[in-house]
């Protein structure tokens, strides 16, 4: 028998290292979840004859209590600690040198019907067989990423990290505590890290489904999430249907198994489900057929040849239970004459595990799960014996008898319900339930604590004297719904609304004002349900755990919003208000050329609907352009120049006005060379939902317009000077792409997630024409003034050329992948370049109709960022999601490559004021400056937070120049964590220049949510969208 080493730590790098260290030593590991009650942890350590406990040193509080108990040796281990002690030759003997082979390599406990957990002895061959089967049928192709996020108490967690390590695939481990407290954050995690494969239980997917549906068809998940494995619970067909509509390109697998069979033994590919549903009426997705080297049979009655108990044999089989014979407690030898309709040959006289689950074989040969005959259930993917919960309850001195059942509501949401008979001397007041719940919290994991308690005088019995479970199941407790309560105008107070929502989430009749949500049965799934019902951030439920405390917080916030509304609506436009530093924004002044300091990441987004004002009033004295020397741009009315500014320094002008005119020296603003600079917010406009789109700023008729849309489907035209609204309209789908104007500036063009491209009147927003593509539109349209065409790509893999005057599509091009990146037009060569998520780059001749393809090139990774053309060489700059920056010639050959240190999701930035630099922003937090002609690195600057948006170079504001050198320019960069940085960049770089002389941060500001919008910076003003539901206007200010 191998020695057993317990691992007391959550999913982490330390955990993965510890697992492989134990295996390398030839021993077995036992996962211990730190969230389990201490009494349960000590019980498992005692019953397993543990030789050593390895605990994560970062969890000092949780680890040290084990040392104090002195039950066995404890090793504290942390990756953050530097090991300075030199180690000599190890005394360990590697497995290959040992005379014996270990019987099992891991020990995992499952709930037992006797009331005691049972330790399953799992084998290496079972784990490897599961991995090799997956790798053969669903191999890892290209650069993918796995996520390790499942609790270590669940058998499926092993394949999460084992599959990544054995296939040399990147493994991303999210903050386990954050996911536990805010289950909805898993969506942002999957998007941010472009996770390719996800393993989850259906109940978790059901909990986050409303948020997924609210966000609509999420292109980022559609492009990155290749495979989703569902296991641990029945997978409803209705849930698959919802998921498939949101993620049509994602492969969904339904796996079935248990800890005794290495986690999984059958599978069903949901791509076969539409075909199957034509011939079968089923409510849950089949569990399918056996995986490689596993044998699955049905043991049942002869009169039902295609139905019976699921029995499993093969390489997946474990070595039985700790301290038990292999041929006991469910492990039996079966013969052919006892099998009703076995699914494999050669199954006589073999050892099988009787799962206790019953299945039926469909005409296709697939198995479908139909239930259990014993009282073992699965909740949130965790298998548990109801008898163990009942045995624990009856240990409570106030309880005489207890029965626990699994119940489901009309939405198939499962929960545990306990029917309790109290001792005669016990007090049956409301406080007894609270006391029992607290007592249970120290005995069992949270998932095993009943959600609802029912006090009964006696348990109903059958005629044979046994507990009548069916009669108990019919004793339904009334629940109250929470739908639409937050919009109710009736007499119910906010407190009653909150309590109703809590009752609905916990499936209980009533709660008191001071009940602790988690003490009375709440868990992360119930918290997700409650947060969705109330429309609040899930983390608030963990912070304000009772209805009364949550009421106080929400009331204070509501009062503050109402006060702000009343104050702002009574002010006129020219009235002054105080500095906006009180609204949660952080502004600081940094000395010129100072280094970037990395601070803690701000809190994540809190998307909350409110009635806050459309804009904030401006203190014209405080933010007077006079603070900047001769600020002609924002003070003179812009003369009669017409031009449009959009992300990546893309400037579009009518045919009568060249781009150079729009940026001529007349518009130049100058700052003294040694002047200190700070940043202030001068207005923000509420967009009712997240603003991921980048702004389009247009100068026309002596006015400055800003066009932008949000996830709320609202598209707005705003006065860029004051923040007042010109007009707004509601589109049919969510907006994530940027807008563009047509050649004569008479219309503005914007796409949405419903696949529609709208042509709106510039002055009024009224609809002129709309074009329907076959997929979502996130790509910013591009205008070709010479031909009066609008070019735009779609998720349907097609590039469209649209004649907005004739209102028709004149050309289509299949691009082999979804088009997120805006095309680039080379007017000199009359060529257009387009890239797709397949990595394909295509050059099209647009000189004469019909248009035709010049060349096609397949690059190694998807392209999400817009393309850029260098003015001097007309090379095309492409940024790949794998971190490569590639320059291609007009003839389609690669000129140079540069590999950054992380993924790139945004396009490069170039400007005539920095002609010798291409700026690229990377997810690793770095901004790279590359030479356009050679690809050599000019400088690299790390702002300390991930970046998913493009930079912007202010072409109108600069520092006073030295006699021999060009003026230093200003560049704005926004991190995805919500920080807006302004860098000072030297245009002319000498080889002897230090890093600080090339680039340095001069100021920064912190917004209150994530930023995925690429900024636009004109004359010291920065326009950017944010996931706090606002579009912001920030202004640089010279410090006196």
Swiss-Prot record:
Keywords: Phosphopantetheine, Phosphoprotein. InterPro entries: ACP-like_sf (IPR036736), AMP-bd_C (IPR025110), AMP-bd_C_sf (IPR045851), AMP-binding_CS (IPR020845), AMP-dep_synth/lig_dom (IPR000873), ANL_N_sf (IPR042099), Beta-ala_Activ/Resist (IPR052091), PP-bd_ACP (IPR009081). It comes from the Eukaryota. PROSITE patterns: AMP_BINDING (PS00455), CARRIER (PS50075), PHOSPHOPANTETHEINE (PS00012). The keyword Nucleotide-binding does not apply. This is Putative acyl-activating enzyme 19. Residues 489-581 form the Carrier domain. Coiled coil: none annotated. Belongs to the ATP-dependent AMP-binding enzyme family. The modification O-(pantetheine 4'-phosphoryl)serine is found at residue 524. It holds the Pfam family AMP-binding_C. PANTHER family: BETA-ALANINE-ACTIVATING ENZYME.
